[in-house]
């Protein structure tokens, strides 16, 4: 058998292997037939330009991947885009909501914050009031090569630069907001207070953000301590769980946790569209008698609260189970839980990469598994849930991680827009304080 005949005999077998691998690992089964035909055609093209069986298989695999990209992976990526992912040209400015952004807050400010804001404008129906030192903002835009886009969006009225002083440093005390009245976080809060923006986002000093929110916006009636609420993924991709507090209050009283539950209940109902949120109390056991004094006393308050669907204690293993819509805890415990879960996505992906087969077959299989791995990362990566809410103040405040980059900024601004567009502040303001 000459080389040409051997090549023709091996080529269909290689294509069949590719198809079997794809059928096992692809999430878009409705496009398998189209992808298979295209891959077969790619193999025929490869066969006409190679002279050995090994090069035929390699070229067929490469062309198959490039063929599947526009037919399968790109449509899947478009299907995965959230309902708020829109074309900027299709959104009228009158339909956009204004969000104030502390452009100087964060380890990567102002560059990464600005980059994320420009991406958010392209994807979400919002406009940005970007607060910061103007010269530094333009310098960062030049370094990133986004000056033309920035100027274009300024001319279109999608973004406005608002001058301020420097930010509150990460190592500064929260009380610095009273001394630095022109700090970027103070100016951003004032925009919300004046009604020029519906929500505010900052990746800067979280203590300073909380202090500025309390001093500038004030607490809601009946709320003693604001709480930071974070959205965690669950087994149900479309229904996260709200956990609060995750860092605002290290030492709590039962009354504080009671208030946290009421705040979380309203947010889950209004913004996450959960008809009757299930409230859980983070504890070391499911039984009513388990836990420390704080847990036992809080359990009694939540059990007697008629405005809540309190379903009992939630163990750590059940936080992501999908059995709870809101989980309440003190800020110390919640922050430990938050930091632990932030590492889960990256660790899991590292394990999966290490377990994938090596060699030529491994490379081909990895190509078809790429989208599956991306979806896993999307659900577990904290950058995809890049903001936490400060609930209990008279305004919508979203806190970003200090190391936030563009993707985290976009995710946080999506949360800010969602909260503002659902009118959650009206229901929070109408919340009656718990009875003593």
Curated annotation (Swiss-Prot):
Single GO MF descriptor: phosphate:acyl-[acyl carrier protein] acyltransferase activity
Annotated metabolic or biological route of this protein: Lipid metabolism; phospholipid metabolism
Record's subcellular location: Cytoplasm
Regions crossing the membrane: none
InterPro entries attached to this UniProt entry: FA_synthesis, Phospholipid_synth_PlsX-like
Family that this chain belongs to: Belongs to the PlsX family.
Quaternary organization: Homodimer. Probably interacts with PlsY.
Protein name in UniProt: Phosphate acyltransferase
Provenance organism: Prochlorococcus marinus (strain SARG / CCMP1375 / SS120)
Name of encoding gene: plsX
């Amino acid at each position: 058998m000459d080389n040409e005949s051997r090549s023709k005999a091996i080529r269909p077998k290689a294509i069949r292997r590719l198809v079997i691998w794809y059928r096992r690992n692809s999430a878009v089964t409705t496009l398998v037939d189209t992808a298979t035909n295209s891959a077969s055609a790619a193999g025929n093209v490869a066969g006409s330009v190679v002279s050995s069986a090994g090069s035929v298989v390699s070229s067929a695999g490469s062309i198959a991947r490039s063929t599947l990209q526009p037919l399968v992976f790109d449509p899947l990526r478009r299907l995965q885009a959230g309902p708020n992912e829109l074309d900027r040209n299709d959104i009228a400015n009158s339909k956009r909501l204004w969000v104030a952004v502390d452009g100087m807050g964060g380890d990567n400010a102002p560059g990464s914050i600005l980059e994320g804001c420009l991406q958010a404008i392209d994807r979400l129906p919002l406009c940005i009031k970007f607060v910061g030192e103007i010269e530094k903002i333009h310098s960062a835009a030049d370094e990133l090569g986004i000056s033309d886009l920035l100027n274009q969006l300024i001319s279109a009225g999608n973004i406005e630069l608002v001058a301020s002083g420097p930010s509150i440093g990460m190592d500064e005390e929260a009380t610095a907001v009273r001394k630095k009245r022109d700090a970027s976080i103070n100016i951003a809060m004032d925009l919300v207070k004046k009604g020029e923006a519906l929500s505010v986002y900052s990746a800067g000093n979280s203590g300073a953000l909380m202090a500025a929110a309390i001093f500038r916006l004030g607490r809601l009636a009946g709320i003693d301590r604001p709480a930071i609420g974070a959205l965690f993924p669950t087994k149900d991709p479309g229904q996260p769980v709200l956990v609060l507090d995750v860092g605002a209050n290290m030492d709590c009283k039962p009354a504080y946790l009671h208030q946290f539950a009421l705040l979380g209940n309203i947010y889950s109902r209004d913004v996450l569209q959960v008809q009757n949120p299930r409230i859980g109390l983070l504890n070391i056991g499911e039984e009513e008698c388990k836990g420390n004094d704080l847990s036992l006393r809080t359990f009694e308050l939540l059990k007697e609260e008629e405005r809540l669907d309190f379903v009992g204690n939630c163990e750590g293993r059940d936080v992501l189970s999908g059995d709870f819509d809101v989980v309440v805890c003190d800020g110390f415990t919640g922050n430990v839980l938050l930091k632990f879960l932030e590492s889960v996505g990256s660790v899991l992906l590292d394990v999966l990469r290490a377990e994938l087969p090596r060699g030529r077959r491994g490379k081909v299989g990895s190509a078809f598994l790429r989208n599956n791995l991306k979806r896993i990362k999307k659900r577990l990566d904290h950058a995809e849930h890049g903001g936490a809410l400060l609930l209990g103040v008279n305004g919508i405040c979203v806190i970003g991680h200090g190391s936030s980059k563009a993707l985290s900024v976009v995710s946080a601004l999506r949360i800010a827009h969602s909260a503002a567009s659902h009118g959650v502040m009206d229901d929070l303001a109408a919340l009656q304080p718990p009875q003593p």
